[in-house]
Structures are given as structure tokens and as C-alpha cells.
Amino acid sequence: FKIIAQWHQYHGVKKAIERALDALTKRKDGKGGVLWFTQGSGKSLLALFYVMNLREHPEFKNPTVVVVTDRNDLDGQLYDTFALSSWSLRGSPVQAEERAELKEILASTEAGGIVFTTINKFAPEQGKNVVDTLCERSNVIVIADEAHRTQYGFNASMDSKTGVTKYGLAKYMRDALPNAIYLGMTGTPISSDDRDTESVFGTYVDIYDMVDAQEDGAVVPVSYESRII
């Protein structure tokens, strides 16, 4: 079977590849930008097309891709999408079920590979506030889906019960993969003092919002009428 990108997916992937190349060769800041694509516009296939295109650019030297979500059902959904299209990816994706398995995969992989995991697996062991560096290569690409939810917590805070200083999971993930390029995908980015999606991942790579999606017929409009009963 064939999978063909819609126009917004095609242009979004093209811009995301350009941003990743810029982060790899020029800025070297690990910020792959934010793809703001509304719910229902095909972000799972967008991620698939992005990985397929990464493989076509020799600058990335057969990158390792880590797809990170914040819950098991979304992790399984994305994994299934990629597994059904493994013929196009030069390898079969793997799903890290346990923290030890994730560490083993990332520490032992020298190039290539697509790993699916949830962000909680990057957390330090109980009672600690540091994590081991798992891979220092710069050709590691992290795709953070629903990036507005868990990609914060870079400043230290103290647990009032234990007195242990801790950080958010996003910092621990970056400590484990310090030279990776991080692409954020979300349908609802956040911009506030302590949570700002753009400040974490870089500026928007491309935007396909609800208005665009409705005009294309990709999603249907939702009407709401308030009533007092």
C-alpha cells in the first residue's frame, strides 16, 4: 500500500528537516522547533514522514530517533503507526517497555534505530536527582509528541516531604541525551512565565491550526450554544 502526505504534512516535514539541519550544523543548540498542528490533522503520519525524510539526508549520518510521549496509550498508538510502515524506515521500530530496556537500547545503539518510550522512563532512581548520560551523539533526534504537557521543569525545586532537590522530566531527558535535537509536536502550545513551548524547543517550524484544517476539510467545526436550564 501507499501512504501519501497531505500538503500541510509535506510542507511541515520539509521545514522541520531544514530546522533540524540548522540545529545540527550551525546553531548546535538542540532546538528542532515546534510543529503546531491541530488535533485530527495527522500528527502521527507527520512524525512518520519526518523520520522517513531524516533517513534521506546524509548530514544526519543515519540518526537514532527517539519518539517520546507522556502516556502509554499514545505511545502504543504511535508505535503501531510506525510498525505498520516499517518497510519505509530501513528498520523496525522498538518499544522500550521498561526503564532498564530504554537505557540498554540507547547506550548500545551506535547509529540508526527508532525507539518509542514514555518520558517517565528518563526519571532518576528513587532518592536521586541525577541521571546517567545514555548517548552523547549529535545525530539523535527526539520527537516529543504532546510537547506542551511535560517538557518543562528545568529549574530546581525541593520536595517538601523528602527534602530532595528535583527537576522536571524534560531536564532529565536532556541530561541523558545532551546533544540530541528536540522537535516538539503539539496541537495546543503553551506560552506562560514558567511553561513556554517555544522557549524549550525553539520557534514554530510550521503552523496548521484549526482554521486551516476546517478550510481543508481535515476536521469538522464544533458549534457550542450555551443554555441555562
Enumerate the language-model features and the residues they cover.
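RecA-like P-loop NTPase motor core of helicase/translocase proteins
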Residues: F1-I229
